[in-house]
């Protein structure tokens, strides 16, 4: 019985690592400072970066907020010029939001983009509903 339990736990732990592993993607289109589009197998998806909020640059009700365009341009330049663009789902969050956007951590050439945006003043930490895997890196 113990051997079966150990085998089951080993398989479970290995499989969860594959589910939430980083996935290399292709940049498609800029939207704003915390949202952009990617291609995966020739299908386009909208990305919403977890745990941060940038000033709005295209919001229909809020309009353009202070530093919204700068945050959007900074993010766009980072993802558009990335040699390697990767996303990673968080095991403590849904994969999509109510708008159908993928909720992910974003890595540009191995660097956590959310951390970069916060450190450079383009984003603030926000929308922390769970204990996310990279939250401590943002502080």
Label each residue range with its predicted role.
Residues 2-10, 17-139:
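Small beta-barrel nucleic-acid-binding modules, primarily SNase/OB-fold domains
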């Amino acid at each position: 019985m113990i051997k079966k339990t150990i085998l089951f736990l080993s398989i479970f732990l290995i499989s969860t690592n594959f589910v939430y592993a980083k996935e290399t993607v292709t940049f498609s289109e800029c939207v704003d400072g915390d949202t952009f589009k990617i291609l995966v197998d020739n299908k386009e998806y909208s990305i919403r970066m977890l745990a941060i909020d940038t000033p709005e640059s295209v919001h229909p009700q809020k309009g353009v907020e202070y530093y919204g365009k700068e945050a959007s341009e900074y993010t766009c330049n980072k993802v558009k010029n990335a040699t390697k663009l990767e996303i990673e789902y968080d095991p403590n969050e849904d994969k999509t939001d109510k708008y159908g956007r993928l909720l992910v951590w974003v890595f540009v050439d191995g660097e956590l983009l959310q951390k970069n945006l916060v450190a450079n003043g383009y984003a603030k930490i926000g929308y922390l509903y769970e204990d996310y895997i990279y939250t401590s890196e943002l502080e």
